[in-house]
A protein has these predicted regions:
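Local sequence-structure signature of Cys/Sec-based thiol-disulfide redox active-site neighborhoods
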Residues: 1-26
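Thiol-based oxidoreductase modules, predominantly thioredoxin-like and allied folds used
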Residues: 5, 28-42
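Hydrophobic residues in alpha-helical membrane-spanning segments
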Residues: 12, 29-32, 53
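Generic recognition of short, well-ordered alpha-helical segments
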Residues: 14-18, 46, 66
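Short, flexible, glycine/charge-rich loop motifs used to bind or transfer phosphoryl groups or to couple energy/partner
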Residues: 23, 42-45
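Secondary-structure boundary motif
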Residues: 25-29, 77-80
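Structural micro-motif
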Residues: 45-57
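Non-catalytic, surface beta->alpha helical segment in thiol-disulfide oxidoreductase systems
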Residues: 55-81
Length: 81
């Protein structure tokens, strides 16, 4: 599962949301969760030290917003392995 951690104070917050929406359209089969750390019930793993953070399992894929093509290529590689 890809989990994307974000918060409203993050300068890239709007871009993160657009990127996640595009990803959901392009890879509808991909388990995906957008975690808004502003929500009181949101759980932040200790290894998430900034936002946005893109996490596959317990592995950080990107800290900061990647280019859409880079994100898609990385996810395709992970799903194929």
């Amino acid at each position: 599962m890809l989990r994307v951690f974000t918060a409203s104070h993050c300068p890239g917050h709007s871009r993160t949301r657009r990127l996640v929406a595009a990803l959901a359209r392009q890879r509808p089969h991909l388990p995906l969760e957008l975690v808004d750390l502003d929500e009181p019930e949101a759980e932040r793993p200790s290894f998430v030290i900034g936002t946005p953070t893109f996490v596959w399992g317990n592995r950080i894929l990107f800290l900061g917003n990647p280019a859409e093509g880079d994100l898609l290529a990385r996810l395709d590689a992970l799903e194929g392995s």
